[in-house]
Curated annotation (Swiss-Prot):
Name assigned to this protein: GPI alpha-1,2-mannosyltransferase 3
Record's GO cellular component terms: endoplasmic reticulum membrane
Pfam families registered for this protein in UniProt: Glyco_transf_22 (PF03901)
Record-annotated membrane-spanning stretches: 53-73, 126-146, 182-202, 214-234, 245-265, 305-325, 330-350, 352-372, 377-397
Glycosylation sites per record: N18, N417
Gene: PIGB
Pathway given in the UniProt record: Glycolipid biosynthesis; glycosylphosphatidylinositol-anchor biosynthesis
E.C. designation(s): 2.4.1.-
Places the protein is found: Endoplasmic reticulum membrane
Location (main, coarse): endoplasmic reticulum
Organism annotation: Bos taurus (Bovine)
Keywords: Endoplasmic reticulum, Glycoprotein, Glycosyltransferase, GPI-anchor biosynthesis, Membrane, Transferase, Transmembrane, Transmembrane helix
Record membrane topology: Multi-pass membrane protein
């Protein structure tokens, strides 16, 4: 029996190890008596892993889903759930990206299908509309985790695979993102599963059609998903003996089918033929207009973004880069290439480099596998540091913008005067979800911020105009009392500045929600809900 160097894997991993060795014995004997893998190895169908491991990772990602109760970026609602809600229930807000056809309907269609099924079953409650899509994303992430583990078992051995698996599961950023309804999350899931079928030396699951289909699907969901795959595709093409056959009989048919599927889906919902992938790349890459939403120095990913995403895995990643076999250089090239390409774009975000995180976990796993004296302290350090950060960012930091939506839900469903209720969100645009988290056609308004596509030098969005002089904006916007909303939602930093308007129009604070310990200029530590008095009484709830 192989010695357990780490001691930190526990009975769970040792049980898996024993099963793996038992299978090796049977293979050596070439016995024909053991032809029932489901009985002898406890494998779970197409996933090809021990049933207990499958159940464990599914349970973990479900717990992960419910332990992430904070907001990250607006796109996880506005570019997925909000669009799906409009597709099924005929109300919901489409941002400017959809009028300009920069986004495709392929990804929202997944959630629209879920919404439609819930609607047909009469189970389309607001809570199910919020949580079922996230649980679906969690299950997809669990499948990706299993594929990464299976791949490393094929390429190396179970001992290396379990350390890569451990690093993947305890990564704070993976925990933070993998259950969110972001295109970046789906991009990462598809990248991992595609890597399982990619032709690597030692892989037993290589399949060019399957991996290229998954890459193509990732591309039509988020066109920049092709960036990490450029080095991998070139490597495959370079090493392939039948290059013409690879292109004509595999890549081109796969690309044609997936792109045609995307065109048909978008034709149905846009009402005209459009190639959203080209529009997306033109806006974000060729024209670099994403800088409207903020720009960073060229080195940001190397100096801040990548270290923050890796967190305490960073020293193990660096260590593993020196230890991993040469055949994994392509993974390192993929990571560096992706960072370099994204560094050339002005607008930078942590989530953009999420798809290369699994590649980094391979090197982190190698580092742990080669540690001897310090293995147990290293495991404890990695687990505790990542889980503390994961729980804080998942349960505490930036939770107010989701919590306040429960207040609006109550306003919609428990208010006898709901027909006269209305809401104005005086916050940076897209701070909160919208109708996907209310599921009622309540009149709501937020401060808009579409970018200038005409080239005006003095262009100001509504949100910027508001924050130049909030009090003046309110008095100019609501000169007639009949136009006043019944409810105002704002960050705490705004309250003092607009207090004359609140007092003169009989608004009273009715709810307070904690948001963050790190307030910024327009984002306060708390969110306030104000309700307008009518005839000496507060609006009834």
């Amino acid at each position: 029996m192989e010695r357990d160097d780490g001691g930190g894997g526990g009975l769970f991993f040792r049980g898996l190890q024993n099963r793996s060795h038992e299978k090796t014995k049977l293979r050596t004997r070439k016995s024909t008596l053991y032809l029932s893998p489901q009985k002898s190895t406890g494998r779970c169908g197409d996933l090809g892993e021990n049933i207990y491991l499958v159940l464990f990772i599914i349970a973990l990602r479900i717990c992960n889903c419910f332990l992430v109760q904070t907001s990250f970026v607006p796109d996880e609602y506005w570019q997925s759930l909000e669009v799906a809600h409009r597709m099924v229930f005929n109300y919901g807000y489409l941002t400017w990206e959809w009028t300009e056809r920069l986004r495709g309907y392929t990804y929202p269609l997944i959630f629209a299908s879920i919404y439609k099924i819930l609607h047909l079953l009469g189970k389309d409650s607001v809570h199910l509309l919020i949580w079922i899509p996230r649980l679906a994303q969690a299950l997809l992430s669990a499948i990706a985790d299993l594929r990464l583990y299976s791949l490393m078992k094929q390429l190396e051995n179970q001992q290396v695979a379990r350390w890569v698996f451990f690093c993947q599961l305890c990564s704070w950023f993976t925990w933070y993102c993998c259950t969110r309804t972001l295109t970046n999350t789906m991009e990462t899931v598809l990248t991992i599963i595609a890597l399982f079928y990619y032709p690597l030396e030692g892989s037993k699951s290589m399949n060019s059609v399957k991996y290229s289909s998954l890459v193509a699907l990732a591309f039509i969901i988020r066109p920049t998903a092709v960036i990490p795959w450029i080095p991998l595709l070139f490597r495959h093409f370079w090493q392939e003996q039948r290059k013409l056959d690879l292109i004509l009989h595999q890549f081109l048919p796969v690309g044609f089918v997936t792109l045609s599927l995307s065109l048909i889906i978008d034709r149905i919902f846009f009402g005209q033929w459009t190639l959203v992938q080209y529009n997306f790349l033109k806006f974000n890459v060729l024209q670099d207009l994403g800088s409207f939403y903020g720009s960073h120095p060229w080195h940001w990913y190397f100096s801040q973004g990548f270290p923050a995403v890796l967190g305490t895995h960073l020293p193990f990643f660096i260590h593993g880069c020196f230890l991993a076999p040469k055949r994994y250089r392509i993974f390192l090239v993929t990571v560096l290439w992706t960072l370099l390409v994204y560094s050339m774009l002005s607008h930078k975000e942590f989530r953009f480099i999420y798809p290369v995180l699994p590649f980094c976990m391979v090197f982190c796993g190698y580092s742990l596998n080669n540690l001897k004296t310090w293995k147990k302290p290293a495991l404890s350090f990695l687990f505790l540091s990542n889980m503390l950060l994961a729980l804080y960012t998942g349960l505490v930091h930036q939770r107010g913008t989701l919590d306040v939506m429960t207040n609006i839900q109550e306003l919609s469903y428990n208010n006898t005067n709901v027909s006269s209720a209305s809401v104005l969100m005086m916050m940076p645009c897209h701070s909160t979800p919208y109708y996907s988290h209310v599921h009622y056609p309540l009149p709501m308004r937020f401060l808009q911020c579409p970018p200038d596509l005409t080239g005006k030098t003095d262009y100001l969005v509504e949100a910027d105009m508001f924050y130049l002089n909030p009090l003046k904006w309110l008095y100019m916007e609501f000169q007639n009392d009949s136009q006043l909303p019944t409810h105002l939602i704002m960050f705490s930093v705004l309250e003092e500045e607009i207090s004359p308007f609140l007092i003169s129009n009989n608004y009273e604070r009715t709810a307070v929600f904690f948001h963050t310990h790190f307030p910024e200029s327009r984002t306060g530590s708390h969110i306030y809900v104000y309700e307008r008095k009518l005839k000496g009484k507060l609006n009834q709830r």
